[in-house]
Design a protein with these regions (language model features):
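Short beta-strands and strand-loop turn motifs
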Residues: 139-142, 170, 215-218, 274-277
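Short, small-residue-enriched loops and turns at beta-alpha junctions
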Residues: 177, 222-226, 281-282
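Active-site phosphate/pyrophosphate- and oxyanion-stabilizing loops and adjacent acidic/basic residues
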Residues: 158, 201-204, 236, 262, ...
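Structural beta-alpha unit
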Residues: 5-17, 60, 86, 97-138, ...
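Small/aliphatic-rich secondary-structure junction motif
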Residues: 10-78, 184-250, 270, 298, ...
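A short acidic, glycine-rich active-site loop
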Residues: 73-90
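Charged helix-capping and loop-helix junction motifs
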Residues: 153-156, 230-234, 287-292
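Intrinsically disordered or low-complexity boundary/linker segments at protein termini
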Residues: 1-34, 106-110, 136-148, 152, ...
Length: 312
């Protein structure tokens, strides 16, 4: 069979960890509460707990001058670090009270949650917690596409995208979490290789997908061969493996992808975009950013980023 010679989807099982909570990194902005909303809805539907995590950068992290050159004395540095710590704990207490009020009003589902405040660089603290506890998912809020470059949590989100070992849910400011958890119209970017099987198994095992409309999308490279045959093969695999969803295919030209993709998402009223993402070193991230990274800065749509671990 010609198509089987092009690509084979064997449906082999992927390894997974037993996960018991949803991790929500926050910076106390307005969209932190939106992220908490989405996280609590997801946790409720999947019988999980929520961990709300904030990290603050003390003076020991913020000093960037060469050794021997100090702006503050040790006493002042400790005072400033203590002040930042106190502010972080007070802000977390305010957020915790607001969440409890939302639960009491019935706005947030009543799920068990904890709050954690840690000293350190945000993306490092998130990675350390995630690697230690292996949450089911990381949920992060962010600004709209025109403001992400100006925003701390936006840049942190971009860093976590490229380093996370567990799925991420990214909720832009202005998105209604009720349209994301659960969701009906989904677009999934496909690499058209075996990693797609891994992506789909993880996604369909962790998200409500019954009666979903799924668009399988791919960027057609100039030197890429058998693209139509490969996406047809994967669409048939999906229809057989997930008969409770409907699937359609869409190919994009690499030169016009971002603009055309944005139009396509609006046309299909897509509420959630699923993107596989392979871990990259800093050189690759700077000079050859991933599709997930590009789309993150270009769209205002909720995203699920799923790490893939198969070799290139």
């Amino acid at each position: 069979n010609a198509i089987n010679n092009v690509i084979s989807f064997d449906g082999s099982e992927t390894k997974g960890n037993k996960c018991s909570n949803v991790l929500v990194p926050v910076d106390f902005s307005n969209y932190s509460l939106i992220a908490c909303d989405a996280a609590f809805r997801y946790a409720f539907r999947h019988n999980l707990n929520v961990c709300i995590l904030h990290s603050y950068i003390s003076e020991s992290y913020s000093e960037t001058l060469p050794p021997g050159i100090k702006i503050f004395s040790e006493r002042i540095r400790k005072e400033k670090s203590t002040e930042k710590k106190d502010i972080a704990y007070k802000q977390m207490a305010v957020l915790e009270n607001e969440i409890r009020e939302q639960i009491a009003k019935g706005v947030f589902p009543d799920v068990k949650f904890e709050v954690v405040v840690e000293e350190g660089i945000p993306e490092d603290v998130i990675a350390e917690y995630s690697n230690k506890n292996m949450p089911a998912i990381i949920v992060m809020g962010t600004r709209g596409k025109h403001q992400k470059d100006e925003d701390l949590i936006g840049s942190v989100t971009a860093e976590v995208i490229d380093s996370a070992e567990v799925p991420m849910m990214i909720i832009p400011n202005g998105i209604n979490p009720t349209e994301v958890v659960p969701v009906k119209n989904i677009a999934v970017y496909c690499n058209l290789d075996q990693s797609d099987v891994e992506t789909f198994k993880m996604f369909f095992s962790r998200f409500d997908t019954v009666d979903c409309n799924v668009s399988l999308v791919h960027i057609k490279g100039k030197r890429e061969k058998f693209v139509i045959e490969r996406i047809d093969a994967f669409c048939r695999y999906c229809n057989a493996e997930y008969p409770y969803c409907t699937f359609e295919e869409r190919l994009f030209d690499e030169n016009t992808f971002l603009d055309e993709f944005d139009k396509y998402l609006k046309e299909k009223e897509t509420k959630l975009l699923v993107l596989p993402n392979k871990k990259r070193n800093i050189f690759m991230r700077l000079f050859n950013p991933s599709i997930a990274h590009k789309v993150f800065f270009h769209t205002d749509i909720a995203m699920i980023v799923i790490p893939t671990h198969l070799n290139e």
